[in-house]
Amino acid sequence: MYLDAIIIGAGFSGLYQLHKCRDQLGLKTLVIEEGKEVGGTWYWNKYPGSRCDTESHIYCYTFSEEIYKNWKWKERYPKQKEILSYLKYVERKLSLRKDIIFNNKVISADYLDKKNLWRVKTDKKKVFYCKYLISAVGSLSAANIPSIKGIKSFKGEWYHSGRWPDKKISFKNQKVAQIGTGSSGIQIAPVVAKSAKSLTVFQRTPNYSVPARNRKLTKTFIKNTKESYKQIKNLLTKTPGGHAFKFSKKSIFDFNESKRLKILEKAWLNGGLSFRACF
């Protein structure tokens, strides 16, 4: 099958690239997705406590004012299920599914110099040819399954945050061991601890985290963000990481200790990533 463009992955980036290539550039485009649904990171990472650490009103597409204003987020930091629902909404809104094939993992991509084409093969023995190949696999979807001695002979249940099963897992009255305290580990531990008989966390490197101060979004906040669509979109292009808060140009040493503590305390109470933008 010959196409103008092939996109690998149906997450945030892949869906946007499909819209861009197909709807705006008029290219015959196909998305190849390993999973059985759109979502990318938010399809694979469905472990207990999984949610975004970026505020919902900016963790979304801004290319469409209609989509931005029609979707209503529930929380400051949305859960995995809410983000997945959002991406499914966008997929339906833009009629993207008809140009996505699921349950196909790209296993090779070779550039054929004489034909000036890419040859893309999947694990289902499908072969495609295209002029443009776009990788939208991201960096948070490939699970790193550690080679732990004895894991194959372990008699109990074990799970990986990046490949969490669809079925509901109960930790009630269970002795649980958790390995790792990265972003996923920090989110998983407090949820598991609520029902487990005991929870032991194995940590190699301590991480620093700030409080999220998560909360339900008020009608006033939702109304204000939608009315400020253009201003928010403009601000996102001018800040590191695309966040809707400005980074201070001042050094921490430009203030005395009393002033420094006041600035930090204010950011701490506000919660979230803006803490790192104080200085």
Give the role of each language-model region.
Residues 100-101, 156-159:
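Conserved beta-strand scaffold positions in the cores of enzyme catalytic domains, especially
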